[in-house]
UniProtKB/Swiss-Prot annotation:
SMART domains: PTI. This is Trypsin inhibitor 1. Gene3D superfamilies: 4.10.75.20. GO terms for cellular component: extracellular region. Its main location: secreted. It is found in: Secreted. One of its GO terms (molecular function) is serine-type endopeptidase inhibitor activity. Disulfide bonds join 4-21, 11-23, 17-29. The record marks 6-7 as: Reactive bond. Inhibits trypsin. Keywords: Disulfide bond, Knottin, Protease inhibitor, Secreted, Serine protease inhibitor. The presence of a 'disulfide through disulfide knot' structurally defines this protein as a knottin.
Length: 30
């Protein structure tokens, strides 16, 4: 899989990231 952006706002805009991982409130995707 691809790496998710680590910044919360970037992750929020990234549909693939949102499908693949949970964006935690402190900004780390995991």
């Amino acid at each position: 899989g691809r790496r998710c952006p680590r910044i919360y706002m970037e992750c929020k805009r990234d549909a693939d990231c949102l499908a693949d991982c949970v964006c935690l409130q402190h900004g780390i995707c995991g």
